[in-house]
């Protein structure tokens, strides 16, 4: 039998078989497949970001008597998770955060008010996940979604707190806007810093 000479003589055919990609896929095709995060990793992220948001919610600039406060960017972890993972995970994590807020700082006057002011209001932060390519728009949509839920709750359930002669809608807009607007400004600023510093990655 004739032996190969030259560079080909050093090639082991078994090595060629070992490096061939399985299932008929080329190396380039396999490298282009999207990476899918495991459910365990996603759950760990949800728990971590909800815990961080809860911790930040205790750092208050000021609080209002019927609920609502300006914090050290407590909405940012939830908004960032929504931008990072998309609306499905974002809405879930935001609703969980709302339930945690209900557990640690409840202000209850009616079951429907609880639904509006906690899982729906905080859950709206997850809407940011629909705008992964436009994070600052996503932050605005999420926070204004929260404002809307609190506003409706205020009109329906807190009208009696309005000063005499003031329409409940005006009262609710002023009351809820007094802490949502500063929270919006703080959140946008922190998201901007994180985005520019590349400390965290929005996209996987």
Where are these regions (language model features)?
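Hydrophobic transmembrane alpha-helices
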Residues: 17-83, 88-92
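Hydrophobic alpha-helical transmembrane segments
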Residues: 43-47, 76, 87-95, 114-115, ...
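Structural signal for the C-terminal ends of transmembrane alpha-helices
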Residues: 83-85, 127-132, 194-199
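Interfacial aromatic-anchored transmembrane helix boundaries in multi-pass membrane proteins
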Residues: 56-70, 96-130, 155-163
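Core segments of transmembrane alpha-helices
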Residues: 75, 117-125, 147, 183-188
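C-terminal TM-helix exit segments that contain a strictly Trp-centered aromatic cap at the helix terminus
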Residues: 145-158
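Alpha-helical transmembrane segments and their cytosolic interface
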Residues: 1-50, 170-204
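Internal alpha-helical transmembrane segments of multi-pass membrane proteins
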Residues: 131-148, 168
């Amino acid at each position: 039998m004739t032996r190969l000479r030259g560079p080909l003589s050093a090639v082991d055919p078994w090595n060629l078989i070992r490096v061939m990609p399985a299932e008929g896929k080329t190396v380039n095709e396999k490298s282009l497949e999207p990476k899918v995060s495991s459910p365990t990793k996603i759950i760990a992220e949800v728990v971590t970001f909800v815990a961080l948001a809860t911790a930040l919610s205790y750092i208050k600039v000021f609080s209002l008597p019927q609920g609502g406060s300006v914090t050290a960017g407590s909405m940012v972890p939830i908004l960032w998770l929504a931008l990072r993972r998309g609306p499905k995970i974002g809405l879930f994590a935001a609703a969980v955060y709302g339930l945690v807020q209900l557990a640690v700082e409840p202000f209850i006057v009616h079951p429907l008010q609880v639904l509006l002011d906690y899982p729906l209001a905080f859950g709206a932060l997850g809407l940011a996940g629909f705008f992964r390519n436009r994070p600052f728009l996503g932050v605005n949509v999420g926070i204004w979604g929260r404002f809307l839920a609190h506003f409706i709750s205020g009109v329906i359930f807190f009208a009696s707190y309005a000063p005499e002669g003031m329409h409940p809608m005006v009262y609710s807009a002023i009351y809820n806007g007094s802490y949502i607007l500063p929270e919006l400004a703080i959140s946008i600023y922190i998201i901007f810093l994180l985005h520019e510093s590349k400390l965290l990655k929005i996209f996987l």
